[in-house]
Amino acid sequence: MLPFFPEPSLSYTQQNRTAVLLLNLGTPDAPTAQAVRPYLKSFLTDRRVVELPKWLWYPILHGLVLTLRPKKSAHAYEKIWFKEGSPLEVYTARQAAALAKRMPDLIVRHAMTYGNPSVADVLSELKAQGAGRLLVIPMYPQYAASSSGAAVDKVCEQLLLQRNQMSVRTVSRFYDDTGYIDAMKNHILRYWAEHGRGKKLMLSFHGVPQKHHDLGDPYPDECRHTAKLLAEALELTEDQYVVSFQSQFGRAKWVTPSTQDLFGKLPKQGVTELDVFCPGFLADCLETMEEIALMGREQFYEAGGKSYRYIPCLNDNPDWIDALVALAEENLGGWR
């Protein structure tokens, strides 16, 4: 077996193109237990995601999680699946297509850290198209080792197999990027103008285990800074918004406050009109459409809430595409 992949037979000038890769988390190929299981296995065996010794984690993963969770997750995916496929895949593809239209001199593709289109397949395609320089934009404004770090790991794994390695730049974070903040502000204001506005805005970010933060992961701090900048842009007072963290998994302690806990507590504190937006998610997916838009609504109403609005993610919003173009241009530097 060859230690490196064969390289395409291209001249130097043919291998001098620049590519941009939008890299998101991933999704199963279908809303079925059979498709969800390998996706979850790929995700939950990543050392960046679960920082436990294999001897401890793998019996739990294979004996319980991969036995029970695929069917439950598949049912959740069924609720939000589009005719074109997974919402995360559909929206990320649209973002890449919009970026490609705005930057026609570049090769623009998207890939998933777990699932399809895979990083391995997309990088092979880029090499075949003559890409010698690659800008990787993990689609996570706030850096976390379990998301941004894992995404870059996948790219580096492929670099290890390239005989003629591409030059690579990565965008590790953009939690305070002006274009990103402005795009969210405009998006929320337009939503409020069309659908009305609740008494409080919840800014819900994906959670991480508290231990990750204790060991130096900056993610929770960057989330709170994003929330502060967005609240200032929206001219909100401190009592008009709340920051929370969702999607806890397992028994470990996670960063707080929990989004799910607040759904139960806020109505009892007199907050019966709630709007929810997820700044850390750039494309709607299972965690936003099912966990927040559907399940969150049920939890809030069961606790006594009267009005609940889920504000969709930026997705392919034109203001966000403008910000994405600017972000790419800034990080491409002399590569264009």
UniProtKB/Swiss-Prot annotation:
Q: Which SUPFAM superfamilies match?
A: Chelatase
* Binding-site residues for Fe cation, renumbered to this chain: H206, E287
| Keyword Metal-binding appears in the UniProt entry | yes
Q: What is its EC number?
A: 4.98.1.1
Describe the reaction catalysed, as an equation. Answer: heme b + 2 H(+) = protoporphyrin IX + Fe(2+)
> What's the source species for this entry?
Neisseria meningitidis serogroup C / serotype 2a (strain ATCC 700532 / DSM 15464 / FAM18)
**Superkingdom of the source species:** Bacteria
Q: Which GO terms describe its biological process?
A: heme biosynthetic process
Could you cite one Gene Ontology molecular function of this protein? metal ion binding
Gene name of this polypeptide: hemH
Name one cellular component (GO) term: cytoplasm
Q: Which UniProt keywords apply?
A: Cytoplasm, Heme biosynthesis, Iron, Lyase, Metal-binding, Porphyrin biosynthesis
Q: What is this protein called?
A: Ferrochelatase
Q: What role does this protein play?
A: Catalyzes the ferrous insertion into protoporphyrin IX.
Describe the family membership recorded for this protein in Swiss-Prot or TrEMBL.
Belongs to the ferrochelatase family.
Q: Report the subcellular localization.
A: Cytoplasm
- Name the top EC class: lyase
Q: Tell me which NCBIfam families the record gives.
A: hemH
**Which pathway does UniProt place it in?**
Porphyrin-containing compound metabolism; protoheme biosynthesis; protoheme from protoporphyrin-IX: step 1/1
